[in-house]
Amino acid sequence: MSKIAFIFPGQGAQYVGMGKDFYDAYEEAREVYRKAKEATGLDIEALCFTENDKLNITEYTQIAMLTTEVALLKVLESKGVHADVCAGLSLGEYGALAAAGVMELENLFQLIRLRGIYMQEAYPVGGAMTAVLGLDAGVIESTLKGIDGIVSIANYNCPGQIVITGEAQAVEMAATALQEAGAKRCIPL
């Protein structure tokens, strides 16, 4: 007997046009975008489907990601595809909560809108985050000590993936230094 798992991504997986094919093809997806717009007052379609500077600002990224995740989820469910288990990374945990039916969508959208706003306030424009792949935490920690400006580890996602954050210029310098120290990749978030 096979089991189905839904895994929801965290912030950093966003891109302009995400979910557009589903939005165009399925009423279930369009309904989710409408509900998110009603709950938050934001033009989620414009945020997700048109070139703009907002999509990569935490305040907007989070609601855009969650709306897209839930839209895809509702399309799959309308086709009879349901998860036996679900999980999510960071922001993706809320997509998993939606899949589990733990919260009403309106409340979930409002919660994530506020989460994005509060995180943005704690992490103002001028800051940056980067995922560092394939480098030992000890090497990252020691490398960051040599960087001018404010930069530190924000999250130990899993072995081999650590997120750094701080002043944009310091994070950029750290990413360069970490790649020189052996990181497989540094991905701005």
Task: Identify the function of each model-found stretch.
Residues 2-87, 164:
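Helix-rich "cap/lid" substructures immediately adjacent to catalytic or cofactor-binding pockets
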Residues 11-13, 40, 100-189:
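Alpha/beta catalytic cores of group-transfer enzymes, especially the acyltransferase/condensing modules
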Residues 47-49, 86-90, 112-113, 189:
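Beta-strand segments within the central parallel beta-sheet cores of soluble alpha/beta enzyme folds
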Residues 48-55, 95-96, 187-189:
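A short small-residue
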Residues 52-53, 87-94, 116, 127-131:
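Short, glycine/charge-rich beta-strand/loop segments that flank catalytic centers
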Residues 69, 84, 88-92, 96, ...:
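Gly/Ala-rich beta-loop-alpha elbow adjacent to hydrolase catalytic centers
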Residues 74-79, 97-103:
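Alpha-helix C-terminal capping segments
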Residues 80, 90, 182:
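Conserved functional loop/turn residues at catalytic and ligand-binding sites
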